[in-house]
């Protein structure tokens, strides 16, 4: 038996937008992220808007490309992870770098899957089948969350993320 392992392969600088064309912005003061109305002209480097999507090779075949996300804010690097809090899985950002090699399960890996085009995707959390990155309204923006879908082929616009 071979355990799951991930080896960092490459990364790309990207912007993540939801179905409403809002841009994902990470706020280090709250260690979370949300989708906000930001125009292309308002995007600034190292302000939590420009993410890196890290691709990993895996020893186990999977449905979707294993990826992790990181972002730089004020010369500090943060990586996206998922943690349980009060019985609910939440998306967090922690200071540090994504690892080059991961042996076993990891709370930073998501499986990138096509949503309905080559630029729109959904990202399934690697540790819980059927849990996807999504957004929900919270105050003036839409907070990045993990959302359980009842069926894998369910079309849910809140899980659609454009790169």
Model-derived regions, located:
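Lectin-like carbohydrate-binding module/patch detector with strong preference for beta-trefoil
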Residues: 1-163
